């Protein structure tokens, strides 16, 4: 989907956390990667993983805010944001970030989206409260087009991907979290919310999911 990247190309991964996506980008693309996260601890962990993976020379960890990017205008060949654009909002992100892309540069983001035009009231109410910007794929594509992007492509992540990479690892994290904060009401409420969300996904995964949007700036 994205071609013509070379050793001088630059990819910015916004909201990278300490995850694996900057490493995978560095391994599979010739371009260099600027990985941005809000917390220094995330960047420290990421760069340690990059060193162990042999890509520390291709990845630059940056502590920064996706609401105020520390990049020059029209300096990036690709903006990548996996499961993070919701922090700023889809419409705001695709609009504000475009000025950092070179002409013909690519935007690649994943976003929670409705997979159907209608859905049960329980899951619609949950998501409209949790993330009011959730919308159908068709409407998200239209928003990208209205913001000046073209050649828009989409693909839906499988439910197995969401379960195996998010909800299952979350179970171990929840257990450790509750062991660390026993008899803590706030901790218990947080875990209860997460477990409720997981149950909703197991019940309603046909109606929503994570969708990748790949678009080229006009």
Where are these regions (language model features)?
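Conserved alpha-helix/loop element of class I SAM-dependent methyltransferases that forms part
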Residues: 1-7
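Class I SAM-dependent methyltransferase SAM/SAH-binding core
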Residues: 12, 18-68
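A short acidic, Gly/Pro-enriched loop at the edge of an enzyme's catalytic core
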Residues: 67-78
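A short SAM/SAH-binding and catalytic strip from SAM-dependent methyltransferases
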Residues: 78-91
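A short glycine-rich, Lys/Arg-flanked "PGG" loop and its adjoining helix->strand segment in the class I
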Residues: 92-106
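Short, glycine-/aromatic-enriched active-site segment of Class I SAM-dependent methyltransferases
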Residues: 112-131
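Short alpha-helix
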Residues: 133-148
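Conserved Class I S-adenosyl-L-methionine
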Residues: 153-218
């Amino acid at each position: 989907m994205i071609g013509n990247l070379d050793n001088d190309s630059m990819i910015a991964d916004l909201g990278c956390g300490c995850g694996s996506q900057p490493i995978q980008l560095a391994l599979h693309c010739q371009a260099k990667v600027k990985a941005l996260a809000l917390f220094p601890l995330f960047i420290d962990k990421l760069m340690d993983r990059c060193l162990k993976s042999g890509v520390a020379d291709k990845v630059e960890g940056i502590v920064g805010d996706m609401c105020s990017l520390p990049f020059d205008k029209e300096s990036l060949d690709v903006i990548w944001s996996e499961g993070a654009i919701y922090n700023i909002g889809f419409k705001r992100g695709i609009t504000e970030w475009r000025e950092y892309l070179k002409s013909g540069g690519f935007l690649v983001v994943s976003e929670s989206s409705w997979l159907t035009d209608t859905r049960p009231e329980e899951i619609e109410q949950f998501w409209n409260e949790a993330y009011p910007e959730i919308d159908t794929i068709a409407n998200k594509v239209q928003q990208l087009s209205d913001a000046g992007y073209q050649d828009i492509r989409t693909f839906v992540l499988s439910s197995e991907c969401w379960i195996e990479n998010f909800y299952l690892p979350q179970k171990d994290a929840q257990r450790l979290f509750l062991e660390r904060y026993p008899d803590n009401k706030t901790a218990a409420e947080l875990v209860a919310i997460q477990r409720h969300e997981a149950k909703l996904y197991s019940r309603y995964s046909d109606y929503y999911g994570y969708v990748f949007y790949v678009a080229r700036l006009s």
